[in-house]
Amino acid sequence: MTPFRRPIVLATSASAPFPPAEAALTDPDGLLAVGGDLSPQRLLNAYAHGIFPWYSDGRPILWWSPDPRMVFRTDGVRLSSRFKRQLRASTWTVRADTAFEQVIDACAASPRPGQDGTWITAEMQQAYIALHRLGHAHSIEVFDGARLVGGIYGVAVGRMFFGESMFSGESGGSKVALAALAADLHGRGWPLIDAQVENPHLLSMGAERLPRAEFLHDVQRQVALAEQPGSWSQRYGEHAASDLCETHLT
């Protein structure tokens, strides 16, 4: 009989190391540790080791590193031919880091199949807003005029982007945000977007399952490549969403 295992309880110090991701449980898949806090130092340390927080309001903070791990190759995000035809006629525009708090708010408010309530608690929102103000968390935003119709946010460490959540205020808004993020990262030589856990929507857009060992190897390599933290807004500017039809996206 396999002995019952519990996740490791983290020390209270933000600088306390995480246990190796390979020590995560298989049931529930990927649960590694419990406790700690959501300070910028701890969050950045977690992502740099392939670990992310995911828990419900009123519960202890849970830290995860599932096996396999869902990822997007930045040259592998798929948009259907039908959606591309709609996009070519669209007047939507795309920006970066101009509405981070609106994006995370909208992600928290979006209903998710099979989930009762949101995992993006008020504590989580404040933690990622703090990371954004430090230049480590970023959003891609899709606008119809002045109205936000889609977005995605996540954390950048080195040349690795860790996606956290996305939303659609109108049909296709999250697809455009993800495709725009992938196109931008691909152009800058960033090969991967972490998508955390499997779901049918991600698979339909080209997400792949990576064995955790391979994912951790890729993360280690990419986070070691220095990138200056800071806002992406000025560098990114504003683009027509229809321009995505002319990129490398399949």
Swiss-Prot record:
Family: Belongs to the L/F-transferase family.
Gene this protein is translated from: aat
Role played: Functions in the N-end rule pathway of protein degradation where it conjugates Leu, Phe and, less efficiently, Met from aminoacyl-tRNAs to the N-termini of proteins containing an N-terminal arginine or lysine.
Catalytic activity: N-terminal L-lysyl-[protein] + L-leucyl-tRNA(Leu) = N-terminal L-leucyl-L-lysyl-[protein] + tRNA(Leu) + H(+); N-terminal L-arginyl-[protein] + L-leucyl-tRNA(Leu) = N-terminal L-leucyl-L-arginyl-[protein] + tRNA(Leu) + H(+); L-phenylalanyl-tRNA(Phe) + an N-terminal L-alpha-aminoacyl-[protein] = an N-terminal L-phenylalanyl-L-alpha-aminoacyl-[protein] + tRNA(Phe)
Subcellular location: Cytoplasm
GO annotation, biological process: protein catabolic process
Matching InterPro entries: Acyl_CoA_acyltransferase, Leu/Phe-tRNA_Trfase, Leu/Phe-tRNA_Trfase_C, Leu/Phe-tRNA_Trfase_N
Keyword annotations: Acyltransferase, Cytoplasm, Transferase
Listed name of the protein: Leucyl/phenylalanyl-tRNA--protein transferase
Keyword Electron transport: no
GO cellular component terms attached to this protein's record: cytoplasm
Broadest EC class assigned to this enzyme: transferase
EC number: 2.3.2.6
Database matches in Pfam families: Leu_Phe_trans
A single GO molecular function term of this UniProt record: leucyl-tRNA--protein transferase activity
